[in-house]
């Protein structure tokens, strides 16, 4: 069926209507996206990172960390740690990773009363925002720092989360940060005659700001 649709079912280009993804995630915290990626410590131990982001504001909601092989139980623990203190949302988008098909994962979502929305099979571009966030975390942060263990990784990712949500502007948000976009704040014109530099992520990132 997939091969037949991929070959013959080609939608006409130039559609102007919103996608179902945009329709569901049109307000803050109405749709969160979740995905996993892997990284290595300074002693070459493998760590898995679960990322939760808000679709509408691009806000990094939280992360969960696990060392070594991962199971459905571990994914539940990581997800619960990532959203701790954040409340819950109605919808959650995940891909077709077998870890997101595990019985414990499904049961955890039922307990939290969260509706799971699956991406299109074999189409990575159907999960673009969280994939881009993971790429940003790798390029701008994890590729530039070293970490020793899970606690060290969690601490450094928490610093990146503060920077990403409060200081890093996004072109798709018209230059806003996720926090200012969520709050509906207007961007005042900057006085470029008085500029100071603010460091983030332990001086890894330096951003100019109006003094």
Tell me what each language-model feature is.
Residues 1-211:
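Charged DNA-binding/catalytic regions of mobile-element recombinases
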């Amino acid at each position: 069926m997939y091969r037949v649709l991929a070959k013959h079912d080609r939608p006409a280009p130039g559609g102007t209507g919103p996608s179902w993804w945009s329709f569901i995630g049109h307000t803050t915290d109405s749709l969160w996206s979740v995905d996993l990626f892997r990284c290595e410590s300074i002693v070459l131990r493998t760590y898995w990172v679960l990322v939760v982001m808000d679709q509408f504001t691009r806000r990094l909601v939280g992360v969960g960390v696990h060392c070594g092989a991962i199971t459905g139980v571990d994914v539940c623990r990581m997800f619960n740690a990532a959203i701790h203190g954040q409340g819950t949302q109605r919808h959650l988008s995940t891909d077709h990773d077998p870890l997101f098909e595990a019985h414990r994962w499904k049961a955890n979502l039922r307990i939290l009363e969260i509706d799971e929305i699956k991406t299109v099979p074999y189409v990575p571009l159907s999960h673009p925002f969280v994939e881009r966030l993971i790429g940003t975390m790798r390029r701008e942060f994890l590729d530039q720092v070293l970490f020793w263990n899970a606690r060290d990784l969690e601490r450094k990712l928490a610093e990146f989360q503060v920077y990403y949500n409060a200081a890093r502007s996004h072109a798709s948000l018209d230059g806003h940060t996720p926090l200012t976009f969520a709050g509906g704040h207007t961007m005042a014109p900057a006085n470029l005659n008085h500029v100071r530099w603010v460091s983030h992520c332990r001086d890894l990132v330096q951003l100019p700001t109006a003094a």
